[in-house]
Amino acid sequence: MTKKVSIRTFGCQMNQADTEIISSLLTAEGYCLVAEEDDADLVMLNTCAVRENAVEKIMHHLDSLKGLRRRRRGLVVGVIGCVPQYYREEMFQKSGVIDFIAGPDSYRKLPGLIRNAFQGIRGAELFLTQSETYGDIEPMRSGSISAFIPVMRGCNNMCAFCVVPFTRGRERSRSLQSVLDEVRRLEGQGYRELTLLGQNVNSYRDDEAGADFALLLDEVSKAAGEMRVRFTTSHPKDISEDLVNVVAQRENVCNAIHLPVQSGSSRMLEVMHRGHTRREYLDKIAMIRSAVPGVALSTDLIAGFCGETEEDHLQTLSLMEEVRFDYAYMFYYSVRPGTYAARHLTDDVALEEKKRRLQEIIDLQSGISGEIFGNDVGSVQEVLAESESRRSSDMLMGRSDTNRVVVFDRQHYQPGDLVRVVIESSTQATLIGRCQDPGEG
């Protein structure tokens, strides 16, 4: 009898891409994917460990599976991805519901782990490699419009606060040819957009082909035909003029760059081991904006890192005002055991102070985003329709070239269509408009 498996994905776009790889591996073994955990013989959680609240969310979900296990005798539960790689066999003590665990480099081992689990044998596969990229596996895509292509895995940067080098291992890249082959398959299958992924995508290297990320992006843009091309995430110290010039010159490469800064204080950037100063970051921003007028810039910000003073916090606010990011992902610092910060620094900013500083960051960014989005009112945006709006089937939701979320009246258009939309109003996170009439403009 065919076993049914449900995979729930937490966290980043790389985890979503990994779930597509895992789905491909398991369907090749004869498993049937189901959406609902209540219908499954096997429940798998693909997990994120980047922040404490992400781990808490996963542990809470594991607690909720205890009731499902009572209702479905023989149910097998697996936890995969960054959380088990981070906590290792301690996961079995954290939750008695877990039957097996596997880290991000061990997904080829899943069929064996699962077979053993159905026989009552617990298992763990947690080896990190310097070679695994899964580049030979055709993902089982979850959508038909946009696709993720992981081009490299891991990170060598060792930022003081970050668990990624411990959960994802050292950097390694796919071959240029394997990436281009996947791009051409997507183009042939009618996909409209692709996103090149990496924990630090700018560090992509294929030494045999003599390719860095700028060359890869250029070659992908040529192979992609009319598909839009995006990429994430970039590290400020690695973004190059060559890369920015590709963004400027290639029409199908979207004018949106995510460039995490974390803090506006050079002192804090040094404590964080970020590898650049405030001035160097601002110089990169100036270089990008000079080459790509109208580019959308987004970032990550941490409030209350170890030793952060009020002056450091004010430096972050002033950098936000100077750069004027289109949007930002904002969090207060939480200690991640095993990181440099946990081992060598003191988490000395009180929780209430972290929350206050974070709220000031959020409030400032909300105002900036509201002004930037408001400036788009009256413009015409070329929008790739992705889905029906959650509020009404008469509306479609999509994204502009600059990664703005745009909601508009659908008329005769369908998801996957590229639509010219006249923007009539905005919020701090969304543009609202109507389809441009034929002959208008």
Swiss-Prot record:
Reaction catalysis annotation: N(6)-dimethylallyladenosine(37) in tRNA + (sulfur carrier)-SH + AH2 + 2 S-adenosyl-L-methionine = 2-methylsulfanyl-N(6)-dimethylallyladenosine(37) in tRNA + (sulfur carrier)-H + 5'-deoxyadenosine + L-methionine + A + S-adenosyl-L-homocysteine + 2 H(+)
Highest taxon listed in the record's lineage: Bacteria
Domain MTTase N-terminal, chain residue ranges per copy: 3-119
InterPro entries: Elp3/MiaA/NifB-like_rSAM, Methylthiotransferase, Methylthiotransferase_CS, Methylthiotransferase_N, Methylthiotransferase_N_sf, MiaB_methiolase, rSAM, rSAM_horseshoe
Residues annotated as domain TRAM: 374-437
The enzyme's E.C. designation: 2.8.4.3
Note describing how the cofactor binds: Binds 2 [4Fe-4S] clusters. One cluster is coordinated with 3 cysteines and an exchangeable S-adenosyl-L-methionine.
Domain Radical SAM core: 141-371
Gene Ontology MF, one: metal ion binding
Keyword Metal-binding: yes
Essential cofactor(s): [4Fe-4S] cluster
Subcellular location: Cytoplasm
Binding site for [4Fe-4S] cluster 2: 155, 159, 162
Residues binding [4Fe-4S] cluster 1: 12, 48, 82
Keyword flag tRNA processing: yes
GO cellular component: cytosol
Function per UniProt: Catalyzes the methylthiolation of N6-(dimethylallyl)adenosine (i(6)A), leading to the formation of 2-methylthio-N6-(dimethylallyl)adenosine (ms(2)i(6)A) at position 37 in tRNAs that read codons beginning with uridine.
Family from the record: Belongs to the methylthiotransferase family. MiaB subfamily.
Entry-linked PANTHER family: CDK5 REGULATORY SUBUNIT-ASSOCIATED PROTEIN 1, MITOCHONDRIAL TRNA METHYLTHIOTRANSFERASE CDK5RAP1
Quaternary state and interactors: Monomer.
Name listed for the protein in its UniProt record: tRNA-2-methylthio-N(6)-dimethylallyladenosine synthase
Organism: Prosthecochloris aestuarii (strain DSM 271 / SK 413)
Gene that produces this protein: miaB
